[in-house]
Amino acid sequence: MIEAVLFDMDGILIDSEREYDKAMREAITRYGHIITDEFLLRVRGIPVEAFKKSLKLEFGRDFPVEKFRNDFKSIVWQNIRQYGMPVKNGVYQLIQYLEVNNIRYAVATSNDRGMAVELLEAADLRGVFEYMV
């Protein structure tokens, strides 16, 4: 019997990975670079510090990582405000099923907590989960 479910937020609950990819591609052009699909796959879901190291390895040690991250976040939020954050198909139905069957559920993410809360809010999922890890 299933006692609990742990959802990965990015790519399972919300379609944030597609939004991140678009924003990253747009932001990197400001620095005269392009981002390959291979790079995007390599950095998907990794912790922030590992992401920063990957940027330096890919684009050089003088690459302005923090400025790029600020540009990237700005583009992500601009797109979310304009278009919303898509929720993956079936999420609401699955949550309803879990509630009806008294199965506890939580959300996991490699995002920092503040960003995760904002993304869940943008997807109308804030407050739905008892725990976040």
Can you say where each PLM-predicted feature lies in the sequence?
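Active-site neighborhood of HAD-like aspartate-dependent phosphohydrolases
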Residues: 1-41
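Short alpha-helical
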Residues: 19, 50, 86, 93, ...
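Substrate-recognition element of Asp-dependent hydrolases with the DxDx(T/V) motif
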Residues: 24, 91-120
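Helix-loop "lid/cap" segments that line or gate small-molecule binding pockets
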Residues: 27-28, 47-62, 119
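Metal-dependent phosphoesterase signature
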Residues: 34, 56-92, 101
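A short, structured active-site edge motif that brings together acidic residues
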Residues: 39-44, 70, 125-133
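Substrate-recognition "cap/lid" segment bordering the active-site pocket of phosphatases
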Residues: 84-86, 106, 112-133
